[in-house]
Amino acid sequence: SQVLLPGGEAAGVANMGLKAWGVPAREGKRMLGYVHVRGQVDALEFALERYDGLKVYATNRVEKVDAPDAWRKVAFALVPRVTDPMARLRISALGQGKVWIDDASLVDEPTNRFGELGCREDLVRAFQKQGLTFLRWGGSMVNVKDYLYRHMTGERTFYHGMWSWWSSYAFMIPEFVRMAAEMKVPCAFSINAYEPVEDAVRLAAWLRRFDLPLYVQIGNEECAGYNPYCGKPDLPSVRRYGESVRRLVTAMRRENPKLKFVNAIMWQAKHMDILEEGFRQTDGFCDYWDLHVGCWGAGSGKNVREACAAFRDMVRRLNPQSKMRLAIFEENGNHHDMRRALAHASILIACREQGDFLLTSCPANALQPYNHNDNGWDQGQVFFTPDKAWLQPCAWAQAMASAAHRDVLVASVVEGQAVEVSATRDDAGRSAVLHVVNGAPEARTLSVAFGGGGWTLARAVCLSANSLTDHNPPDDPERIRPRDVTETFRKTPQMPPESYLVLTYARP
């Protein structure tokens, strides 16, 4: 926005935030903000107001803004006198001058370490509610020339992004890694595939301070032809990428030997010649290959099994001694309903079968503003508005799987009516868990038998909905959530249509 000031007058702009939802003002709750400015003006006034500007809830003023040649970050604080979930932020220039403003932020004052790191505290709580044990920061945002580590430290500005022409460096790799470290969760992040080596080395050195597993992905969906920067699915592109990987990994590993590295060539079975050349180019440098899989409902685990089998076959043919393994950094489904929850549960069943050969599986996307999507990926695990955050069905499926995790895979056989099943147990052999997906539109009666005796049902938890397209709206955020059905299942061991069931058994 540009603000022009006739002599002695005031002019300004007002904004109600994303989708004009409003800024959630709470009486007495201090809010911290900033805006980037360029130009000169006698003063800037910041105010929280009613949506129409007729009532003012809080004001603050910064005198003498003098930034004629470069953008300057101006910080301010506001303490509203009333509660209003639909307030607006006004920025006015006072006196004489001319000033440009951009990239404004206003958030509640932090109450814990996550807030101090620049995170919305309720969003982090939503991550924790899922029981996440791995985080990944990446996507096509890295496939632009200005997505570079050198711009992610110190004073930040903005850049021309993949999804939005004006994109912010405000929350990037440093903030993400600090958040993961505070959560005590291993994490992966993508860097530009053609990051300058000297900057990559600085990043590797900075990462030495963190005592958690860190995985550096070189690029994202490379050699896929999705945009000009990521390269085409041809041999010149894959060799150019391989050369950059070897250069970056060699330098970063020398600086920080603890780092693990991930190949980002897009796995497309129709381009096996490209995949094989990509393997030759990066084998011995990358520890993992990132696999992106589609998930469209129950049965999606088949996609994982097929891709893992193809990768294993390629490795056996080209270098049986290779230590490269797989990681699923994106489960993509373009929907966030009950169907997506069944897809994730199905994929996790297939992932357990792979053991240590598969590092993790991350359902995309972690976050999505309610009723707002810029890039077509309508698949948020956690939805949010300015004043709340809540889990969609897939995130609840993740929470169920995490809460019932056991380390040891147990052989399982399904007879009769088709359901998807995986069985696990603890190291002591006293607790066993069955993960069961029923993708059929009919209920299924289950008869569970163990190879050894003494097992009794300890708990049954079920996730189901009235329809595969059901999701959780903001006015009913727990419409679809796990329900304890232990007593019901003991009496009638039946599984609802199109549902995910976790059965926990115990023995002395």
Q: What name fits each language-model region?
A:
Residues 454-495:
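Acidic, Ser/Thr/Pro-rich beta/coil linker or hinge segments at domain junctions
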Residues 327-430:
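Aromatic/acidic polysaccharide-binding cleft in carbohydrate-active enzymes
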Residues 107-117, 156-169, 186-195, 221-242, ...:
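The substrate-binding groove and active-site-proximal loops of carbohydrate-active enzymes
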Residues 87-98, 235-348, 354-357, 417-418, ...:
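Noncatalytic carbohydrate-binding groove/subsite architecture in carbohydrate-active enzymes
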Residues 418-454, 460-465, 498-504:
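Carbohydrate-binding surface patches
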Residues 1-171, 186, 201, 228, ...:
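Extracellular and organelle-lumenal recognition/adhesion modules and their flexible linkers in secreted
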Residues 72-76, 491, 501:
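Short strand-edge motifs at loop-to-beta-strand transitions and within beta-strands
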Residues 88, 111, 115-132, 176-183, ...:
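An active-site-proximal structural segment forming one wall of the substrate-binding cleft
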